[in-house]
Amino acid sequence: MRFGLNIDHIVTLREVRKTYEPEILEALFIAKNTHKVDLITIHLREDRRHIQNEDVLRLLEISPLPINIECSINAAITDFLCSLKNKPSKVTIVPENRNEVTTEGGLDCSLKGLEEVIRAYHNKGIEVSLFIDPLKDALHFAREHQVKQVEFHTGVYANLHNALYSNANNQIHAISALKDKSPKELKEELHNAFLQLRRMSKEAFFMGITACAGHGLNYTNVKELLKIPSLRELNIGHSVVSKAVLVGLEKAILEMAQLIKR
């Protein structure tokens, strides 16, 4: 299983104070020196709430690890990434809503302009991945447009697992739609969400598409996904950075790697 470390929220801490620390390149080399991280993931959002254009340039220039850039189909971002001298190892196209706290679901594959953006990256020799819900129609869209990799949105699975097996439902930011569900309901919905991820990962494999997954994964809910042999990569960020605040980035990375690289 490949471990993609998302370092967005290291930069979030920097941007809160509009200062120079924490240094994104220091985080990059801490990750690299663990010898457990396979790629670095960043999300270049339209509102630049964390990662900035300059971060992209610096990372691509110096990174010894592959860089996966998440972004919307925004024309300015597409033009910027296509113009780069140092190319990312892949671009993962994600849905984006400026009012969202974090990505809320998979990509709408009927989105106007999506096909043109995929073509633009392919024309520059940049691999494209699509951040999608685990649905067969989305996989067929990927195959039809020569997209060789997808990342399944695991938010539904992760939220259900957290509600059932942690104290998430008793926290200040508990998800209201899950608070009133019984443990039996949560368990059934979680099982169905897991089965859907497993089915679609297998479907992707038979289509010749590499299946990755990410969103909301943490040190508890990630373990079950290791039972899906067709999954090849997990992208994890917030939970690792959250733990790093308490125990340090190196230790946080190593603890996650110990779980997913068994």
From Swiss-Prot:
Catalytic reaction list: 3-amino-2-oxopropyl phosphate + 1-deoxy-D-xylulose 5-phosphate = pyridoxine 5'-phosphate + phosphate + 2 H2O + H(+)
Could you state one GO cellular component term attached to this entry? cytosol
One molecular function GO term is: pyridoxine 5'-phosphate synthase activity
Q: Which domain of life is it from?
A: Bacteria
Q: Where is this site: Transition state stabilizer?
A: E151
Q: Where does 1-deoxy-D-xylulose 5-phosphate bind?
A: D8, H9, R45, H50, T102
The record's EC number reads 2.6.99.2
Q: Which residues bind 3-amino-2-oxopropyl phosphate?
A: N6, R17, G216, G237, H238
Is Magnesium one of the keywords UniProt gives this record? no
Looking at its record, which EC class is this enzyme? Answer: transferase
InterPro entries to which the protein is assigned, alphabetical: Aldolase_TIM, PyrdxlP_synth_PdxJ, Pyridoxine-5'_phos_synth
- Keyword vocabulary terms for this entry: Cytoplasm, Pyridoxine biosynthesis, Transferase
Q: Which GO terms describe its biological process?
A: pyridoxine biosynthetic process
> What do we know about how this protein assembles, alone or with others?
Homooctamer; tetramer of dimers.
The protein's role, per its UniProt record: Catalyzes the complicated ring closure reaction between the two acyclic compounds 1-deoxy-D-xylulose-5-phosphate (DXP) and 3-amino-2-oxopropyl phosphate (1-amino-acetone-3-phosphate or AAP) to form pyridoxine 5'-phosphate (PNP) and inorganic phosphate.
Stored PANTHER family: PYRIDOXINE 5'-PHOSPHATE SYNTHASE
What is the protein name stated in its UniProt record?
A: Pyridoxine 5'-phosphate synthase
UniProt source species: Helicobacter pylori (strain G27)
Q: What is the lineage of its organism?
A: Bacteria, Pseudomonadati, Campylobacterota, Epsilonproteobacteria, Campylobacterales
